[in-house]
Amino acid sequence: ATRKIDMAWLGGFTFVQASLRTRGTAVPLVQRAEDARFTSKFITASEGIKGFADLKGKTFAFGAPSSTSGHLIPRYFLGQEGINPDRDFKNTAFSGAHDATVAFVQAGKVDAGVLNASVWDKLVEQKKVDTTKVRVFATTPPYFDYNWTVRGDLDPKLQARLRDAFLKLDAANPAHKEIMALQRASKFIPTKAENYKGIESAAQAAGLLK
């Protein structure tokens, strides 16, 4: 909105916020294929938690307040399951980061938490979480998440070149492999603002848009 940034990597919720602040002019160019069907994982180290009903009266950790996958979508999904975090949890914490949420749960600081599936998979792969203690007990339905967004007044030709550069990235190409690995992307695909209307509706329902 202040024209200080030409391009940014945004989560679904932060894109919605950017879109509203720029009066709908921000343009989402591309997203990872994984972001077209993103999910969040609910985790616990408590044997007594088998489902959402068991969360009532328990302590719970979200990620950052502005996180799509660590707060907004999980909060909305909890509401769909009849759980009001502000009313039903004994205490609600914001860890600030997905890996911190796992650390909170593993250390027993909270009874349960939620994080994005990509980070969970990475931590499991890197053996940075003890899966004999911490387990996934629920997964959200899929939703659109991260994207690369540009200012709406950026030269359309430059927008097209940027989009094409992402779409040409190939994980099988050694020259592209490191970039793709850093983004944990199998490939990039085009996206559009309409894909994030569901997130905007969820944010409004959760009272997170002012």
Model-inferred region functions:
Residues 1, 55, 105-106, 162:
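Hydrophobic residues within well-ordered alpha-helices
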Residues 17-18, 73, 122, 198:
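Phosphate- and divalent-cation-binding pockets in alpha/beta enzyme and binding domains
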